[in-house]
Amino acid sequence: MQTAATSTFFANPHVKHLPGPFLRPSPHYGALVHLPSFRNKTPISIAMAASPSPPPLQELTITRPDDWHLHLREGDVLAAVLPHSAMHFGRAIVMPNLKPPVTTTARALEYREEILRALPPGSNFVPLMTLYLTDNTSPEEIKLAKKSGVVFAVKLYPSGATTNSQDGVTDIFGKCLPVLEEMARQEMPLLVHGEVTDQHVDTFDREKVFIEKILAPLVQRLPQLKIVMEHITTMDAVNFVESCKEGHVAATVTPQHLLLNRNALFQGGLQPHNYCLPVLKRETHRQAIVSAVTSGSKQYFLGTDSAPHDKRRKECSCGCAGIYSAPVALSLYAKVFEQAGALDKLEAFTSFNGPDFYGLPRNTSKIVLRKSAWKVPDTYSYSSGEIVPMFTGNTLEWLPSDQLEE
C-alpha cells in the first residue's frame, strides 16, 4: 500500500472565508548534491535544479463509471436527482431504504419501473436493485430475487443505524442465518452498513466494534458469502478488507470519506451538510482510506452514498444524515487520485473493480474528465424545495463531460 497523499483537504467547503477547497503541496526548489573532485579527491557542492516535472494532465478518458451505492428516493426528489447520476454513471446499486422499505422482489420491480420512467430521454442508465434485509426475510425471497434478474444484492441495515433503518436486522446470527446461507448458495452479495447501534458504544467506534463483533465472525462462519462493506470510514475497515480473500470481501468508498475528516463537521460552526452516517472520522483514518483506494487494490470501488435531503431537513434542530454528492462525485474522486499521484489507477476504481466483483460486464462507453474549473451550484431546486450539494458554492478543477465517447 502506498503512502497517503501529501496534499490533503482540511478546510471546510461550506465556510466561504477559509482557503480554497484543496491545499497545494509545497513547490520543490532543488537540492544540493555532493560530488567528488577528480583532482583533489575532496567533495564539492553544486546546486542541482530539480528535474522538470511533466506538465499536469489536462484531459483523462476513462471507461464510463458505475456507482455501487446510491440513494435515489422517490417521487419529485427522484425526478430531480436521477439526471445527475444518469449523466455520468452507467449503472448504480440502488439502496432500498424507502418508506416503507423495499423488502420483496415484487416491490423492487415496481421501484425499478418508477426509476426507469423518471430517466431523461435517451438515457442508458441501468438501476441495479437491492432488497432490504429484515428479521423476517425468507430464503424463498432470495431465490425469487435471484431469478428476477434485476435484484443484484441484499442490504443489511442494523436496526436504527441510519436513515430509515428502523425495520433493519436485530438478530443476524439467529433469524437471518438461513437467509444468508441461501444468499451464499445463490451468489447474492450482502451489502453491509457496518455499524453497531449499542448505545454504550462511542459513535466514532461503531464501525470498529461492528467488524469485531459481527463482520469478522460472519466471514468466518460463511466464507463463501460475498460481502461489500459499504462506505468504509476507518483504517480498521481497511485492515479487515485486506485481510479477507479478494473476490469475497470488498468495500465501497465515498468522496466525503476520502476528502473530509471530522473537523469538517465543526469548522466555522456546525456544518449539517457535512453530516452523514457513518460519521466522518479523524485524519489518520482518512489518510488510510486514501492510501488503500489509490494503491490499485481490486477490493475497493466507487460508491458515492449520494443521499439527497431537502435543505430544510438538513438545516434544522435534528438534521438528517446524508450528503448529496452525485453532481460532484467524479470531480472529487479525480482530485483525490491526482493528489495521490495515482490518476493511472482512477479507472480501475471507478469502472472496473465494481463490475468485476459483481460478475457483471464492464461498460464499453467512455467518459472524458477535463481540467476545467467549474463552480458547484449553491442548491438544486425541485418541486417541493431545494437540495444542497456537497461542496456547495466551491470551485472544482475536474469537469466530467456530458457527452460519452464510444
UniProtKB/Swiss-Prot annotation:
Protein name per the record: Dihydroorotase, mitochondrial
Residues bearing the modification N6-carboxylysine: K155
One Pfam family, short name: Amidohydro_1
Annotated keywords: Hydrolase, Metal-binding, Mitochondrion, Pyrimidine biosynthesis, Transit peptide, Zinc
Reactions listed under catalytic activity: (S)-dihydroorotate + H2O = N-carbamoyl-L-aspartate + H(+)
Provenance organism: Oryza sativa subsp. japonica
Family under the similarity heading: Belongs to the metallo-dependent hydrolases superfamily. DHOase family. Class II DHOase subfamily.
GO molecular function ontology, one term from the record: dihydroorotase activity
Main location per the UniProt record: mitochondrion
Residues that, per the record, bind Zn(2+) 1: H69, H71, K155, D305
Pathway this chain belongs to: Pyrimidine metabolism; UMP biosynthesis via de novo pathway; (S)-dihydroorotate from bicarbonate: step 3/3
Protein origin, superkingdom: Eukaryota
Cofactor binding: number and manner: Binds 2 Zn(2+) ions per subunit.
